[in-house]
Regions:
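Residue-level detection of beta-strand-connecting loop/turn positions
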Residues: 65-66, 111
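Core catalytic region of metal-dependent phosphoesterases/phosphodiesterases
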Residues: 1-64
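Active-site neighborhood of phospho(di)ester-bond hydrolases with catalytic His/Asp-centered motifs
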Residues: 1-5, 35-41, 70-73, 94-100, ...
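Conserved beta-sheet core of the metallophosphoesterase superfamily
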Residues: 75-153
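Short acidic/glycine-rich loop or secondary-structure boundary segments that cap or lie
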Residues: 9-12, 45-48, 70, 78-81, ...
Length: 155
């Protein structure tokens, strides 16, 4: 699951020296059958033209065990502005998964809900590592690019 801003991260951040969107799109296009993506605030129809998998969905909903995961970029829906999953609130025991802030997070909110953020592979913020998050068999792991695990959360 890619949480948006796939090829570009907007004008507020300097381009990293390693910025190579053509290499990123080639790598991702090769893996298109295994990717689910949501649109970030910097993703455009022009980006979609060069990618061979859909990236413009505003959100994705899927299950992890008994938990419903609402995955979105985070610039529209977040813990301050919850997504419209049920009248008045998100469902009991749901997970709100988003990027946007580039800061890893694993925080409870509401009644039995979780907010999770994988951080950022390309432009981490607040002193966090270049990293990502995996989900296997009900276990979330936050990892550095070298593969080291720095946080684990079991559902």
């Amino acid at each position: 699951m890619l949480l948006g801003d796939i090829l570009y991260h907007g004008p507020r951040n300097d381009l990293p020296d390693e910025y190579a969107p053509k290499q990123v799109l080639a790598m991702l296009n090769e893996r298109r059958e295994r990717l689910f993506c949501v649109r970030g605030n910097c993703d455009t129809e022009v980006d979609q033209m060069v990618l061979t998998f859909p990236i413009l969905a505003d959100y994705s909903i899927f299950l992890a065990g008994s938990r419903l995961i609402y995955a979105t970029h985070g610039h529209v829906y977040n813990t301050a502005h919850l997504p419209p999953l049920c009248p008045g609130a998100i469902l009991l025991r749901d997970i709100l998964l988003h990027g946007h802030t580039h800061v890893p997070a694993w925080e409870p909110f509401g009644e039995n809900n979780l907010y999770l953020n994988p951080g950022s592979v390309s432009i981490p913020k607040n002193g966090s590592a270049h990293g990502y998050m995996t989900l296997e068999d009900g276990v979330f792991e936050w990892k550095t690019l070298s593969g080291g695990v720095y946080h684990t959360l079991t559902l």
